[in-house]
C-alpha cells in the first residue's frame, strides 16, 4: 500500500504562482522597524508633509453634508471628467472625450493596475526602465506579464537610452512602461528622448503606459509634456495620473486614466467589477482641487524646490554624489564611498541615527549603491536629517579606513 503523499500546508498552496513570485516590498520592512522607534526623521515615504489645502477639504465636507454618499458612474462624476478634459487640453494640448476616454480611479495606483490587467496576456513582455517605482513590476506580474528591464545609470543622469529600449524588443513585447518624472531618481525624459521613444513605439506597434503622477512637480528649466500629446501617441498611450502628490491628497485616493475609447471600454470592465467607482466625496474634493488649486500646487512646488536644493547640496558636500533631480520629490545619492551596500547603509542609519531612507535596490538592480531620500518633509527636519546622515557617513568612512 502506497504511503499518502505529503502536501504542503494549505496556506502555502492557497496562494497563486503570481503572488508567490512577487517578493514583499523592499520598503515595508524598514517602516516596520521605524514604527517601533522614537525621534525618527523619515525620508522614506513618498508623501507630501502638507495637509490637503483647506478649501479642498471643505469641498469634501460639503459633499457629505449634501448627502453625496452614493455611487457615481463607473467612469466617475461627469463634472470631474469634464474638468479633467479641460485641464489636459489646456496644459498639454491633448484632447479627450470626457464621456468615453476618461476614467476616475482610486488613486493612480489603481489606474496602473487596471491598465495592465486589461491589456496584458500571459507572457506579454513590458519594457520598463529601472530604477523605477516599486509597484510597477508586481503590477506587471499580477497581470500575467513579464517585466523586461532597461537599466539607467547615475553616470548618464539616469537618462533612458532609446537605443537600449529598442534592443530589448522581442516578438513578445507588448508595451513600453514609462514612469516620469521618475520615482526614485527624479530623472525626466528630455524632448529628444521622448520623441525617439515615440518613434520606436510606432515603428514596433507598441502600447505605451505612461504614469505621470509627478507631472506638476518639475523644477528648473524642465517643462513636462504628456506622452500622449506627442505625434502618433494619443492612439497608443494609456495616460495615468492623480491628485495625491501635487495637491497633497494621498489619503483621498483619487486618480485618473485617459485612453482611446476602444481601450478605455475594456479597462472600465475591470474597474466596474472590482471597484465600482471612486469615492464620491473624494471626487468632489478633487474637482475643487483641479479647478481652484493652481496656487496651492505652485506654493508647494516652490517649497519642494527649496528643499531639493538643500538636500542635493547637503549630500554632495558630505561626499555622497547626488544627481540633481528635475522632477518628483526624491534624491537618490550614491553611497558606495561609505563602504556599505545600500541595505546595510539604510538599516544602520535608521538604528544609529534614527533617519529612515530606502535602499536603492528596492527599485531595481541598478539602484544598488544608492538610497532614496524623500524631501517632502519640513525644511527644518531635512536640516537635522542631513546633520545626522553626515555624522553617520563620517563614522562609516572612519571604519572603512581602519580596516586592514
What are these regions (language model features)?
Residues 1-15, 20-23, 33-37, 41, ...:
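PLP-dependent class I/II
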Residues 30, 63-87, 91-92:
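N-terminal Rossmann-like NAD(P)+-binding subdomain of aldehyde/semialdehyde dehydrogenases
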Amino acid at each position: 500500500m502506497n504511503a499518502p503523499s505529503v502536501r504542503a500546508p494549505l496556506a502555502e498552496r492557497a496562494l497563486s504562482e503570481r503572488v508567490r513570485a512577487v517578493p514583499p516590498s523592499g520598503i515595508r520592512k524598514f517602516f516596520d522597524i521605524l514604527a517601533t522607534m522614537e525621534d525618527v526623521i523619515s525620508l522614506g515615504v513618498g508623501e507630501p508633509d502638507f495637509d490637503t489645502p483647506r478649501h479642498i477639504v471643505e469641498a469634501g465636507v460639503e459633499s457629505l453634508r449634501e448627502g453625496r454618499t452614493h455611487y457615481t458612474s463607473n467612469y466617475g462624476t461627469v463634472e470631474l471628467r469634464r474638468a479633467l478634459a479641460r485641464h489636459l487640453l489646456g496644459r498639454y494640448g491633448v484632447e479627450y472625450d470626457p464621456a468615453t476616454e476618461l476614467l476616475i480611479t482610486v488613486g493612480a495606483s489603481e489606474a496602473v493596475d487596471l491598465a495592465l490587467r486589461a491589456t496584458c496576456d500571459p507572457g506579454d513582455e513590458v519594457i520598463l526602465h529601472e530604477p523605477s517605482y516599486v509597484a510597477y513590476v508586481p503590477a506587471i506580474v499580477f497581470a500575467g506579464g513579464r517585466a523586461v528591464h532597461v537599466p539607467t545609470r547615475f553616470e548618464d543622469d539616469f537618462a533612458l537610452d532609446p537605443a537600449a529600449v529598442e534592443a530589448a524588443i522581442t516578438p513578445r513585447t507588448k508595451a513600453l512602461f514609462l514612469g516620469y518624472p521618475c520615482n526614485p531618481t527624479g530623472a525626466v525624459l528630455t524632448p529628444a528622448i521622448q520623441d525617439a521613444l515615440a518613434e520606436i513605439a510606432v515603428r514596433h506597434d507598441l502600447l505605451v503606459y505612461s504614469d505621470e503622477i509627478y507631472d506638476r512637480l518639475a523644477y528648473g528649466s524642465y517643462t513636462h509634456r504628456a506622452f500622449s500629446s506627442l505625434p502618433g501617441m494619443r492612439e497608443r498611450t494609456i495616460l495615468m495620473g492623480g491628485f495625491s502628490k501635487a495637491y497633497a491628497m494621498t489619503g483621498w485616493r483619487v486618480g485618473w486614466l485617459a485612453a482611446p475609447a476602444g481601450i478605455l471600454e475594456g479597462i472600465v470592465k475591470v474597474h466596474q467589477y472590482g471597484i465600482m467607482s471612486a469615492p464620491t466625496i473624494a471626487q468632489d474634493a478633487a474637482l475643487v482641487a483641479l479647478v481652484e488649486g493652481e496656487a496651492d500646487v505652485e506654493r508647494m512646488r516652490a517649497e519642494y524646490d527649496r528643499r531639493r536644493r538643500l538636500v542635493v547640496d547637503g549630500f554632495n558636500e558630505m561626499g555622497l554624489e547626488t544627481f540633481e533631480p528635475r522632477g518628483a520629490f526624491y534624491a537618490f545619492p550614491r553611497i558606495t564611498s561609505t563602504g556599505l551596500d545600500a541595505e546595510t547603509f539604510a538599516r544602520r542609519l535608521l538604528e544609529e541615527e534614527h533617519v529612515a531612507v530606502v535602499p536603492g535596490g528596492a527599485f531595481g538592480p541598478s539602484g544598488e549603491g544608492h538610497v532614496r531620500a524623500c524631501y517632502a518633509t519640513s525644511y527644518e527636519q531635512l536640516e537635522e536629517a542631513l546633520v545626522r546622515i553626515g555624522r553617520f557617513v563620517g563614522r562609516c568612512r572612519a571604519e572603512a579606513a581602519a580596516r586592514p
